[in-house]
């Protein structure tokens, strides 16, 4: 209840508000006090002798009764709006008051009766320009998961302009009519119907329009603005001078202008539009509608996203589209098919002009994009672009690329290959090359020495101390393991081979000759790690050998034949393509060798210079890989390599001073090896369903290498011998290490 005794605003009406002040129940203090005054030259004071207070309640009227209501309300609102300053909280209280007396602010009741229920929902009016710094979480009844967020649901009017600062989020859910808004940072969201008397100016932060702006211009110079599907810009213009605007709603009765620093995108409907900045229909792939005419100026950019399958951003113009400026095409994930078409402009009233520039640099140069202008539309056509061979840097890559360039588009490989960029092509072509097949025969040539070394280590006349020289028949078994590496070069990949095996032989001496035969099995694993390619080779060996000594002069020789069952696998994996390939085929190795040496020394120690020549020939059968589009078929040329070695061997008996003969011998040697003939090999291959062949080279063997050997031999009994040995060769392009253990017996 209010009367003239509890609310008289007078000249302070603009800062005055009414509150209940009539017949307010209040505490009453009464009673009597006994005291006296004491006066001196320096002071006057009241001395209390006794007091008898009484306390009661009663109804009181006046401004003193009304003031505590206002003070309490202000305290509550300061807690509710911790991000507002004192004057702003006061204005919230004033502008949400319930009008009393004469309409508007009057000298009796001021703004009217305080209304806390309305006040906690935010301003009722912006009486002055107001800068809201949202940097604290709202208090009171507003609960939200964010740090600084609030929702003002009142209908806000007034002559003031709202400036939104701070990182927080302010939502206005009412139907507002104040004097425009400025967004500097954080988020400002308009959900109701807003008929503002000045523009909404987005300078930074994020602006959201889920309601409507009526007869109000939306101008952006920065930040990100989003007009949702329910957002409406009615009888108002949109000016994008900077920042990003995603327009997904409806513009009616206004026009749109995009300045040189602005970006407009979305899937909504706009009025007539002029673009001197950038327009990018869709929010990924989508259509933006211009209900009117469209003009793209000389500085304008149309950024169109193209997705595989012929899907693209599109601009639908109900009037006339006048083109100029630049078209920039942007890719989406996937594979683009040659022959695809992308319709990105449709103008019901016709097309005028053309783009001055086009930019397809975001796509592979192996695709060619061209524009086709029609009466009412514009499209992009996709065709084959630069050749893959133009990006190849090695002979192998150029050979593969030339064959791939000739493949028909429906053969599987051209589609993913044409999506690549030049810096990716080299590695992909290496993986497609099938170089493993060209490297395999060279790995077999390198591994052939294990059989030769076993043959040459059987020498006529090797008799244990105390043994009967008539023991003319011998048998032996040898286990071996080795690792070889062909380093490759700028054109070929590094190739490694790990071998193991078991050889056995029997020989007989007659008339100074030792003649024998051997057989064995083994396994060789060839790997090109960089190319994700490998072969597993099962080996079967047969051979014959003979040797003769004429005093210090020794002559040794032999022949061997090996059959190899090759199981190869390759994995080809690059962007948009994956294939696992395998093949099974046979190969054969034939070799013949002869060695002559002259030994100086006696039974306990000696030196032997020697000269050795070997001829190794390898042939591979037809290769037919199983797999997808990257499968290869073809043949590797026959390989013929001559290997000549000159060196010096030594042996030394190891015996104690009390022993007459040595049962333990140290042996070793060093030599120089030269390879001639086929040091590298070519494979003539073709892709699946293609007859166009290409030649790829495998990693070469070294033309020269240093060879070394070291071992121990021990006579376990007069008829049994155990030998342990190491041999290796070291070339500029290859390395080879092997170890063996052999047990032999004479009988």
Residue ranges and their predicted role:
Residues 80-91:
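Short, charged, surface-exposed loops that flank catalytic or proteolytic processing sites
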Residues 410-606, 723-747:
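Outer membrane beta-barrel translocator domains of Type V secretion systems
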Residues 83, 95-153, 157, 312, ...:
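Outer-membrane translocation/initiation segment of Type V secreted surface proteins
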Residues 39, 43-63, 68-69, 79, ...:
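Extracellular repeat-rich scaffold modules on cell surfaces
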Residues 215, 230-237, 251, 255-343, ...:
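Extracellular beta-strand/loop-rich repeat segments of large surface/secreted proteins
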Residues 1-75:
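Extracellular S/T/G-rich loop segment that most often corresponds to the catalytic His/Ser-adjacent loop
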Residues 590, 614, 626, 630-747:
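Outer membrane beta-barrel transmembrane domains
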Residues 44-53, 185, 491-510, 631-639:
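Short secondary-structure subsegments characteristic of cysteine-rich extracellular domains
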């Amino acid at each position: 209840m209010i009367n003239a005794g509890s609310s008289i605003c007078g000249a302070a009406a603009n800062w005055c508000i009414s509150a209940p002040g009539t017949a307010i129940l209040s505490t009453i203090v009464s009673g009597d006090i006994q005291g006296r005054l004491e006066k001196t030259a320096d002071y006057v004071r009241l001395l209390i002798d006794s007091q008898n207070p009484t306390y009661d309640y009663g109804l009181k009227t006046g401004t003193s009764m009304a003031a505590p209501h206002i003070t309490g309300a202000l305290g509550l609102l300061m807690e509710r709006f911790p991000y507002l300053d004192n004057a702003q909280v006061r204005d919230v209280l004033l502008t949400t008051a319930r009008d009393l007396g004469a309409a508007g602010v009057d000298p009796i009741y001021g703004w009217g009766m305080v209304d806390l229920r309305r006040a906690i929902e935010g301003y009722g009016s912006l009486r002055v320009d107001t800068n809201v710094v949202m940097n604290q979480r709202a208090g009171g009844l507003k609960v939200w998961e964010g740090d600084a967020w609030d929702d003002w649901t009142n209908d806000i009017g007034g002559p003031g302009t709202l400036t939104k600062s701070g990182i927080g989020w302010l939502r206005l859910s009412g139907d507002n009519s104040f004097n425009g808004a400025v967004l500097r940072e954080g988020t400002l969201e308009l959900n109701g119907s807003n008929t503002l008397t000045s523009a909404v100016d987005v300078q930074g932060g994020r602006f959201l329009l889920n309601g409507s702006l009526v007869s109000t211009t939306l101008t952006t110079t920065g930040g990100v603005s989003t007009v949702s599907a329910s957002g409406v810009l009615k009888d108002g213009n949109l000016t994008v001078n900077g920042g990003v605007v995603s327009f997904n709603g409806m513009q009616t009765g206004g026009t749109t202008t995009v300045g040189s620093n602005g970006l407009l995108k979305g899937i909504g409907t706009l009025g007539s539009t002029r673009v001197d900045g950038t327009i990018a229909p869709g929010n990924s792939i989508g259509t933006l509608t211009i209900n009117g005419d469209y003009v793209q100026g000389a500085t304008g950019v149309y950024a169109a996203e193209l997705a595989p399958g012929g899907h693209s951003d599109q601009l639908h113009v109900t009037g006339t589209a006048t083109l100029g400026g630049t078209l920039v095409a942007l890719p989406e994930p996937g594979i683009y098919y040659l022959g695809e078409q992308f319709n990105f402009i449709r103008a019901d009233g016709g097309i005028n002009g053309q783009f001055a520039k086009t930019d397809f640099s975001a796509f592979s140069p192996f695709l060619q994009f061209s524009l086709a202008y029609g009466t009412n539309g514009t499209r992009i056509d996709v065709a084959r672009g630069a050749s893959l061979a133009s990006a190849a840097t090695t002979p192998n890559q150029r050979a593969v690329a030339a064959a791939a360039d000739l493949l028909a588009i429906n053969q599987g490989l051209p589609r993913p290959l044409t999506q690549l960029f030049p810096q990716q092509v080299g590695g992909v072509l290496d993986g497609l090359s099938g170089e493993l097949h060209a490297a395999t025969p060279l790995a077999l040539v390198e591994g052939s020495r294990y059989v030769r070394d076993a043959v040459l280590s059987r020498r006529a006349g090797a008799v244990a101390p105390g043994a009967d020289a008539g023991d003319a028949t011998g048998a032996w078994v040898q286990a071996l393991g080795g690792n070889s590496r062909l380093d490759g070069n700028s054109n070929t990949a590094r190739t490694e081979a790990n071998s193991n095996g078991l050889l056995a032989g029997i020989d007989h001496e007659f008339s100074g000759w030792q003649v024998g035969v051997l057989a064995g099995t083994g396994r060789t694993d060839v790997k090109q790690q960089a190319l994700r390619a490998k072969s597993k080779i099962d080996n079967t060996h047969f051979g014959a050998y003979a040797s003769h000594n004429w005093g210090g002069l020794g002559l040794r020789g032999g022949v061997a034949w090996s059959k190899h069952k090759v199981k190869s696998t390759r994995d080809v994996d690059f962007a948009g393509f994956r294939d696992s390939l395998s093949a099974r085929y046979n190969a054969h190795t034939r070799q013949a060798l002869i060695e002559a040496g002259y030994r100086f020394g006696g039974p306990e120690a000696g030196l032997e210079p020697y000269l050795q020549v070997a001829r190794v020939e390898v042939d591979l059968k037809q290769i037919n890989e199983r797999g997808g589009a990257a499968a290869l078929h073809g043949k590797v040329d026959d390989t013929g390599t001559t290997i000549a070695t000159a060196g010096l061997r030594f042996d030394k008996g190891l015996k104690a001073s009390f022993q007459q003969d040595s049962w333990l011998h140290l042996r070793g040697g060093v030599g120089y090896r030269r390879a001639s003939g086929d040091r590298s090999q070519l494979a003539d291959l073709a892709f699946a369903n293609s007859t166009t062949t290409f030649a790829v080279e495998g990693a070469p063997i070294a033309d020269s290498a240093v060879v070394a050997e070291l071992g121990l031999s021990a006579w376990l009994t007069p008829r049994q011998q155990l030998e342990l040995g190491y041999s290796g060769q070291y070339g500029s392009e290859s390395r080879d290490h092997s170890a063996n253990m052999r047990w032999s017996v004479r009988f």
